[in-house]
Regions:
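Acidic, Ser/Thr/Pro-rich beta/coil linker or hinge segments at domain junctions
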Residues: 171-218
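Active-site glycine-rich loop that binds ribose-phosphate moieties when present
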Residues: 22-34, 67-89
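Active-site-proximal betaalpha loop/short-helix elements
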Residues: 73-149
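Glycine-rich anion-binding loops of enzyme active sites
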Residues: 1-59, 182-184
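Solvent-exposed alpha-helices and their adjacent loops that cap or buttress functional pockets
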Residues: 13-19, 36-40, 58, 86-90, ...
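General beta-strand structural signal in soluble alpha/beta enzymes
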Residues: 3-7, 46-49, 96-100, 122-124, ...
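Helix N-cap motif at beta-to-alpha junctions
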Residues: 157-162
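A short beta-alpha structural unit
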Residues: 150-156
Length: 218
């Protein structure tokens, strides 16, 4: 017998929800669990949609700017009928899958690189981000790579099947999916466990998570 105890804290405006919330958790047995960090050299990194949508929206709301900045909307949604479906179809070729929530894709990529002692190279011009989101976050001095997304996933996929997975994602409705990078053997000790970004003009920069004080609103 095992006792399962869990809890969570939410920050809500006064008067909006001054009651006890009861949540539930489900446990099950998976025949083929989806890994979250089993990267291999050569894997392609796929993002299934526009990044930073949720984080930008929450930041605008926190600053009282949501009504003044056009085009911002949280991307919170279910991925079970699209992304999960494709992962299950290509289960043997998907080596890692994560949702880039708090900390954005920068956090997930760095965790993957550190855990596996590999280098991940990202092509920044391939990352799907809407102009409205990028412009707002740049004006606020915030890196969109570190902002939360609630309706996309990051995948590390065998290079031999990555383009097939990409096309399948687009077929099921994830039309903004893109291959944004690849997993590499570190060229030296400094690059071990690092994420390197190739800029739009061909320069190289380290991509590291940048913290920003946002409430955990899901």
């Amino acid at each position: 017998n095992v006792s399962l105890i869990g809890g969570d804290f939410k920050v809500m405006p006064r008067g909006s929800l001054d009651k006890i919330l009861i949540t539930g958790v489900g446990l099950g047995i998976s025949k083929k669990p989806i890994p979250d960090n089993e990267l291999r050299v050569g894997d392609k990194i796929i993002v299934t949609g526009h990044v930073a949508e949720h984080g930008a929206t929450i930041l605008a709301a926190q600053l009282g700017l949501l009504d003044k900045v056009k085009g911002l909307k949280s991307d919170t949604r279910s991925l079970t009928k699209t992304v999960l479906k494709v992962i299950e179809e290509f289960r043997d070729y998907v080596h890692a899958a994560r949702d880039p929530t708090r900390g954005g894709i920068a956090s997930v990529l760095n965790e993957w690189a550190r855990t596996n002692n590999l280098t991940i190279r990202i092509h920044k011009d391939k990352i799907p981000v809407r102009d409205e989101v990028r412009d707002f976050l740049e004006a606020m001095g915030v890196d969109y790579l570190s902002m939360a997304s609630e309706g996309i996933a990051l995948l590390a996929v065998d290079s031999g099947r990555a383009h097939e997975v990409l096309e399948r994602l687009r077929e099921v409705g994830e039309v903004n999916s893109e291959i944004i990078g690849e997993v590499m053997e570190p060229a030296n000790n400094f690059l071990k466990g690092r994420v390197v970004g190739i800029t739009e003009v061909g320069g190289k920069v380290l991509i590291e998570p940048k913290s920003i004080n946002l409430p955990r609103i899901c």
